[in-house]
Amino acid sequence: MEGLLIALIPMFAWGSIGFVSNKIGGRPNQQTFGMTLGALLFAIIVWLFKQPEMTASLWIFGILGGILWSVGQNGQFQAMKYMGVSVANPLSSGAQLVGGSLVGALVFHEWTKPIQFILGLTALTLLVIGFYFSSKRDVSEQALATHQEFSKGFATIAYSTVGYISYAVLFNNIMKFDAMAVILPMAVGMCLGAICFMKFRVNFEAVVVKNMITGLMWGVGNVFMLLAAAKAGLAIAFSFSQLGVIISIIGGILFLGETKTKKEQKWVVMGILCFVMGAILLGIVKSY
């Protein structure tokens, strides 16, 4: 029971980042920079308490991973501007799950048993269906939704997904570091990536400083993800962490005023259910 409660914390922490950042405001580049500053602050605090051994390879690959992460996060913030948080977040999370699972299964042979392929392919099918319903719009309302530039949103989700999957593959399949040790080099890389997106014009504006809270939320989610994996197992921790899309959808509608027609509300619920079932199945696949 304790493990399940701990697993809820990453779900809420990561799932809230999108609507909290958009409630604070700022351009995507400012949101990314503010978030990475918060992550760097969190990483420094962790390092002061843990003081792990820091090797050259840890710094090099940690910084590289952080830069890749910043590409993913910046693209996600861009997509939120085009599509809204309640649409962009589930699409981004689903794309990462599908892409990451396929890379893991086909390139790194993470699926070796028949049951893994059966459950894994079923999960991916559910996630794709979830994609469809989460982004489906009421045709009668499309003329009123000119501010939601979905084509640009899908393009930004595409490069965001490449960034996130590359970062995940680097840390999970190529270089395996202690999470508490690599968090500082990674946070440095995240900041460097964010500064590149700002074209090296660094301004510590109020909106940037306020967005640091999302970086702290990211850090808290990471720590409790590790604790949940230790207490309840990786399958539970992974599945629960992916359910943050529910929080982002609800948060976008309640706190950002993103409107949905009755048809779209039904489609969103169907999409959420598919995401939940798909994420749980992928968690089960990881347990084999």
Curated annotation (Swiss-Prot):
InterPro entries: Sugar_transport (IPR010651). The keyword Transmembrane applies. It is a multi-pass membrane protein. Keywords: Cell membrane, Membrane, Sugar transport, Transmembrane, Transmembrane helix, Transport. Its main location: membrane. The keyword Ion transport does not apply. GO terms for cellular component: plasma membrane. The chain crosses the membrane at residues 4-26, 33-50, 55-72, 85-107, 117-134, 154-171, 181-200, 207-229, 234-256, 268-285. GO terms for molecular function: carbohydrate transmembrane transporter activity. Belongs to the GRP transporter (TC 2.A.7.5) family. This is Putative sugar uptake protein SAG2157.
